[in-house]
């Protein structure tokens, strides 16, 4: 497949991450264009990635095959309505804005269009992201491949069968980094109370999190089995696990993810008006 021409509407952090991932994969600078209202941001992105960055959204999409909508959700309706006259029916629209349903994007863009809705997460900034993608009925197989390649430039990209699953993706991976940050904070605090220096407790916690994630990724067994293998009867790990479970750890996680998923659905209803 030939490299598509990609236009980014909005050149903030997530767009910059995607552009950087594409450039690292060898996508020519000439195939990428971006737009942004801020002169300072335009200069920064143009200088960092050697791509054409313009002020006009219409100019950015003029010859694009793929148009990536990377503006804040609150601004999406106005941006789409202003951009609609400049778009061609065959251009693939990829939205990385949280909470905006495909139907709303199509309505704001004026007609049924091929739309892929994505839910990336912040580790994409380090090209370690996890994204869920949903394609509407107008998206072709070739366009699905283009969208998948785009998000794969910053991590893993997994396709969803139902747009409603975006809420679950938001709960698991979209908001997920914050859950791990919270656990890291709690472990560091507890380690300090046990007598470690703040720096030592933090470094041990972060390296343990990284090592555990790498073990889980490289293993062919479920995390539950990995946990069992490192939990000796009557040992220190078992004592900690029993304390977690006695205090309802699994139920607490389920409740938290349900709350995030429900809030995602509520925001989609509000932002999609």
UniProtKB/Swiss-Prot annotation:
Q: Entry's SUPFAM superfamilies?
A: 6-phosphogluconate dehydrogenase C-terminal domain-like, NAD(P)-binding Rossmann-fold domains
Q: Where in the cell is it found?
A: Cytoplasm
For this chain's UniProt record, which GO biological process terms are given?
L-proline biosynthetic process; proline biosynthetic process
What does it catalyze? L-proline + NADP(+) = (S)-1-pyrroline-5-carboxylate + NADPH + 2 H(+); L-proline + NAD(+) = (S)-1-pyrroline-5-carboxylate + NADH + 2 H(+)
Q: What is its EC number?
A: 1.5.1.2
Naming one, the record's GO cellular component terms include:
cytoplasm
Q: Where on the tree of life does the source sit, at the highest rank?
A: Bacteria
In which pathway is this protein known to take part?
Answer: Amino-acid biosynthesis; L-proline biosynthesis; L-proline from L-glutamate 5-semialdehyde: step 1/1
- What is the scientific name of the source organism? Pseudomonas aeruginosa (strain ATCC 15692 / DSM 22644 / CIP 104116 / JCM 14847 / LMG 12228 / 1C / PRS 101 / PAO1)
Q: Which InterPro entries match?
A: 6-PGluconate_DH-like_C_sf, NAD(P)-bd_dom_sf, P5C_Rdtase_cat_N, P5CR-like_CS, P5CR_dimer, Pyrroline-COOH_reductase
Q: Which GO terms describe its molecular function?
A: pyrroline-5-carboxylate reductase activity
UniProt family annotation: Belongs to the pyrroline-5-carboxylate reductase family.
**Name by which UniProt lists this protein:** Pyrroline-5-carboxylate reductase
Per its database record, what is this protein's job? Catalyzes the reduction of 1-pyrroline-5-carboxylate (PCA) to L-proline.
**PANTHER family (UniProt xref):** PYRROLINE-5-CARBOXYLATE REDUCTASE, PYRROLINE-5-CARBOXYLATE REDUCTASE 3
Q: Which Pfam families match?
A: F420_oxidored, P5CR_dimer
Keywords in UniProt for this one?
Answer: Amino-acid biosynthesis, Cytoplasm, NADP, Oxidoreductase, Proline biosynthesis
């Amino acid at each position: 497949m030939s490299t598509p021409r990609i236009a980014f509407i909005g050149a903030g952090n997530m767009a910059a991450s995607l552009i950087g991932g594409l450039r690292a994969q060898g996508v020519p600078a000439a195939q990428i264009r971006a737009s942004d209202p801020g002169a300072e941001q335009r200069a920064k992105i143009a200088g960092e990635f050697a791509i054409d960055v313009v002020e006009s959204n219409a100019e950015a999409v003029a010859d694009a095959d793929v148009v990536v909508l990377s503006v804040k959700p609150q601004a999406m309706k106005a941006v789409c309505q202003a951009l609609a006259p400049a778009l061609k029916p065959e251009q693939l629209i990829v939205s990385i804005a949280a909470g905006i349903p495909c139907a709303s994007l199509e309505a704001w863009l004026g007609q049924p269009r091929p739309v892929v809705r994505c839910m990336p997460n912040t580790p994409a900034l380090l090209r370690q992201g996890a994204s869920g993608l949903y394609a509407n009925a107008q998206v072709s197989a070739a366009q699905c491949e283009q969208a998948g390649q785009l998000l794969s430039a910053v991590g893993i990209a997994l396709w969803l069968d139902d747009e409603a699953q975006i809420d679950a993706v938001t709960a698991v991976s979209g908001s997920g980094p914050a859950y791990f940050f919270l656990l890291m904070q709690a472990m560091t605090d507890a380690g300090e109370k046990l007598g470690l220096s703040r720096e030592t407790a933090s470094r041990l916690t972060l390296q343990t999190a990284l090592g555990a994630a790498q073990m889980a990724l490289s293993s062919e067994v479920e995390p539950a089995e990995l946990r069992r293998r490192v939990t000796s009867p009557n040992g220190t790990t078992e004592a900690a696990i029993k304390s977690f479970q006695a205090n309802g750890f699994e139920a607490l996680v389920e409740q938290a993810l349900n709350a995030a998923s429900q809030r995602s659905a509520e925001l989609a209803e509000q932002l999609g008006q």
